[in-house]
Design a protein with these regions (language model features):
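N-terminal secretory signal peptides that target proteins for export/translocation
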Residues: 1-6
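Bacterial N-terminal signal peptides
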Residues: 9-21
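Hydrophobic alpha-helical bundle signature of multipass membrane enzymes
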Residues: 27-210, 237, 249-250
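Interfacial helix-loop-helix junctions of multi-pass membrane proteins
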Residues: 202-233, 240
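Extracytoplasmic/periplasmic copper-protein system
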Residues: 245
Length: 250
């Protein structure tokens, strides 16, 4: 049964899961919605509160993460079109797979793949926990900036097949963390890059088909991950720790 479930997860591709061209359209609309905003100004206490392990908020260039779509805008309406489409066509198996990823950490997203040849070594777990701290700090800060409610809180017709999680919606923390981990792993295991990025895309899509995130939330999470990884690679402490994790793969 475990092998059957794993094959199910790996067999899901982003293309196969997309409802018509809607989700792709939502991503295209997000990228075409105008010049991204400058990183918001924050006070010193706010910056300290949003600091992670390797990164500090004031060091981040957040312009790659577009502002949340305005309520009632073309992008916002497309979000709900896609959400309703998924609500009508999602399967029990897809909802079950999405529920298995309610947590957001390395083991949830990539642990089953046993990329280290067995159980994840404690040092690797600690490394990804530290990276997760940077991801969480950044997405929580941006959620506080944009204050976009969850889709089911905005439209009573949205019926999630996942628990109605608390908190704000934009950007998706699950999407940001899954992609950030995938980018790191793809650098460590370049031959498996396509598989790793597809798994991150799948994890993001689970949040949409489950009814707890708008498509543009997940697209923004991915953009945030790209920005975070760019900054992480500039940090000597991160590079040193990444080198140590790379040695665990040999």
């Amino acid at each position: 049964m475990a092998n059957l479930f794993r094959r199910f997860l790996l067999s899901l591709s982003l293309t196969a899961l997309l409802p018509l061209a809607g989700y792709a359209g939502a991503l295209a609309d997000l990228g075409a919605s105008g010049a991204p905003p400058a990183a918001p100004e924050v006070s010193a206490p706010d910056r300290a509160a949003a600091s992670g392990h390797y990164l500090k908020l004031e060091e981040l260039d957040l312009r790659a993460v577009p502002a949340a779509p305005a309520a009632g805008s073309r992008e916002d309406k497309e979000d709900f079109r896609v959400l309703y489409d998924w609500q009508a066509r999602r399967t029990a198996a897809q909802c079950s797979a999405a529920k298995a990823e309610m947590s957001h950490d390395y083991e949830t997203f990539f642990g089953k793949m046993q990329l280290f040849g067995g159980p994840t070594p404690p040092a690797a777990k600690e490394f990804f926990k530290n990276v997760a701290g940077d991801s969480v700090a950044a997405h929580k800060y941006l959620k506080g900036v944009y204050k976009r409610e969850r889709p089911f809180a905005r439209d009573a017709g949205i019926k999630p097949c996942l628990p109605r999680v608390a908190g704000l919606s934009y950007p998706s923390g699950h999407s940001a963390m899954a992609r950030l981990f995938a980018l790191i792993l793809a650098d460590l295991l370049p031959a498996r890059r396509a598989e790793l990025m597809a798994k991150a895309d799948e994890s993001a899509l689970f949040r949409v088909l489950g009814g707890v995130h708008h498509p543009t939330d997940t697209a923004a999470g991915k953009a945030l991950a790209d920005a975070l990884y760019k900054e992480l690679k500039s940090k000597p402490a991160f590079r040193s720790d990444l080198k140590a994790v790379r040695a665990l793969l040999n």
